[in-house]
Amino acid sequence: MESIPLRKKILETIVSKSTLKQKVFDNTFATFNDLKETLLEMASEMDDQLDGLLDRRVRLEYRDRGKFEAQIQVANALLIFQMHTDVFEFGSDHLIWQNPYVQADRDNSYCGLINIYNFLSDSFKFNRNADEGYLIGRIFINRERRYFAEGKQQNSMRAMDFGKSEIGQEALVAILESAIGFALNFDLLMPPYEENKRVTVDQFNTKMDNSKFVTGKRLGYDFDVEDI
């Protein structure tokens, strides 16, 4: 049976989109593995540099949590790096569409995503499931390993710089150091008194048994304009 024009177009789209997205995924996955190796090296180097300068209980600890997640604990801050398994295109109002590199070829806009979250380490240690964290950064990688970063203090490669450089270890170190620096200076805020002044005996006992008085850092996907 001969392919009708529409079917032919569908088949061509399947081939082109699948090839494009697979390339983006492969680049993002390779970058995430590079990120994990860089994190491990940074944690080891900084831990050695801190030796003798502070309590041994305050260390940098790297944890590999599988193919798509890694963590680094710095004092009471826990940074979680998570690679999304899907490939994305940007909304029509995103700044990326003003970038000449993307305007020259729409396929350049398809990106893989690595999220950077900031939590309190005790939230996981004591299973405080109600505690909140904060998305502090995102790394985007495309089919050509070109990249840019969004988030708090991520100034190394903005959306309008997308296409100028391939992501490598130097870029990863800059992104990771910015994320760690921000997390260390993002202190826990005291909850308002009015939100905590009344508690039942059952609530108190339950929370004490599980160390679950709600604390934490905010979680959200919205960045301020100056962060993008």
Predicted regions and their residues:
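Short N-terminal edge-element motif at the start of the domain
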Residues: 23-69
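Intrinsically disordered, low-complexity linear regions
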Residues: 2-9, 55-57, 62-82, 104, ...
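Glycine-rich, aromatic-bearing surface loops/beta-hairpins
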Residues: 135-228
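Short, solvent-exposed secondary-structure capping/transition elements
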Residues: 44-55, 82-83, 90-92, 188-192
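Residues that form generic nucleotide/phosphate-binding pockets
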Residues: 13, 17, 42, 175-178, ...
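Short, charged/polar micro-motifs that form catalytic or ligand-binding hotspots
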Residues: 18, 22-36, 158-169
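N-terminal, Lys/Arg- and Ser/Thr-rich interaction peptides
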Residues: 1-22
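Hydrophobic-cavity lipid-handling domains and compact docking modules
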Residues: 56-145, 149-157
